[in-house]
Amino acid sequence: MNPSRPRVAAIGPLTPHLYTPTPARPLRAKLLRLRADTRVVPHAHPWGQVALSSTGVIRVTAPHGSYIVPPSRAVWIPPGVEHAVTVIEDAELLTLYLHQPRGRFGPARSAAESAGWRQCRVLEVSSLLLALALQLDASPDAPRAAPSRETLARERRLAALLLDELRRAAPVRLGIDLPQEKRLRRLCEAVIEAPSRHATLAAWAADTGASARTLTRLFRSELGTSFVQWRQQVLLARAVPLAARKLPMARIAAELGYASPSAFAAMVRRSVGAPPSRFLRASEGRQRV
């Protein structure tokens, strides 16, 4: 861990009540610039939310998962789900709030379509989706005067296109499952924060006060996987924003604690069945769709 790394600055929810979506304005936008190591404390609200960064990288943590979000990705957060946001790199955080009619989740047009939107999910962000989102009026409700009729009409047209684009956005399996058991939760959050700090479960166990055998059992019972497989998902998720910064493969491997690019490449092949160049290029290509 880098001793010169600044401490995380915790702040409260970023005035979501000033951007409340309604039937008249079903899709609201909020745009904020946040410094690295800022953490928005856990909170929830009664509407749906899409969190994305037009620049920089954020991490969204919910009860059952953690999601690293570079500009090519977004995270859907259903109504009422508690979540926290950590800024990994200086970011322009764009938040979309969705009014949710009773029985509907996300941009679904029917209760049947809502099934896939009842849980947090990572989505691809096309250039069209991002461009539409950036065109929405991101002004708060107060103390500003009510928007004009022309503004509302334009907002409704943009919202219709945005909701359609969200329905078309492909889900991406880059979320990191999180356990509920307290000891394992602490370990998992520490790994996500600094995945290259230790390579083995035994080394991480020394930091938690639980034995490696106990943690192995907890990984299986809580997450249905092994520590090695779970940590690989963390490393893959961390690799995506590094690739978005155009870092060479050797630098990405070193950042993630691998002794050589070939060792990193072997891990990627085992995990996703493709070489890292193809896996990471796909992540960048989706951003330009």
Regions found by a protein language model. Name each.
Residues 1-12, 244-245, 266-289:
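…primarily DNA-binding HTH/wHTH and HhH modules…
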Residues 1-58:
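Generic protein-terminus/edge-of-domain signal
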Residues 64-79:
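Short acidic-glycine-tyrosine-enriched beta hairpin
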Residues 66, 80-104, 108:
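Ligand-binding loop in jelly-roll beta-barrel domains
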Residues 72, 215, 219, 263-264, ...:
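Short hydrophobic/aromatic patch on the recognition helix
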Residues 118-119, 143-211, 221-233:
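Short, Lys/Arg-enriched, Trp-marked, Pro/Gly-tolerant hinge/linker segments that flank
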Residues 198, 202, 221-261, 281-289:
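Terminal helix-turn-helix DNA-binding modules in bacterial transcription factors
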Residues 206, 217, 221, 254-255, ...:
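Alpha-helical residues within the helix-turn-helix
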